[in-house]
Amino acid sequence: MSTKFDPEKAENLEEIEKQFAVKAVGHAQTYWQLLEAVPPKSLKLTKIDDEIYDDFLEQFPEYKANPSMVEVIDENVLKSQENKQRWFKFMNAYEKKVQDYTFGSLLRMNVKEDYTEKNTMFVPRMQFYVFEIARNKLGMNDHVYDSAKSSK
């Protein structure tokens, strides 16, 4: 069958959606286990964490001015029409540098809470990296490691 596939006209098949969800949940579980096992400040999510972090603060200075926006992410602000364009431009700069940069990932909205249905949003992998790199550098994920360490 050699028909051309048009992603704009493709239907979201339930099975494909389930596969994406399973993969995203697996990624979240693995990341949580890393946070519990390794001090977050020493955790590297990509080979270019520092570059991503510096570029993020330069392209999105509001997060540098107000780190609480990294701690508790407002999904409406993040996914606003204005910010969609900014994020699209930012993420595309990493197309050849970060593997699976557009793949869907689960991101906790409030860093102080676990992955739950109410505290999770679906974002491109690059946004996950940006916020979790920032959270790790700012010590916002330390509580996960400290809690796991003290319960052993």
Predicted regions and their residues:
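Nuclease and nuclease-like effector domains acting on nucleic acids or nucleotide cofactors
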Residues: M1-K96, E132-K152
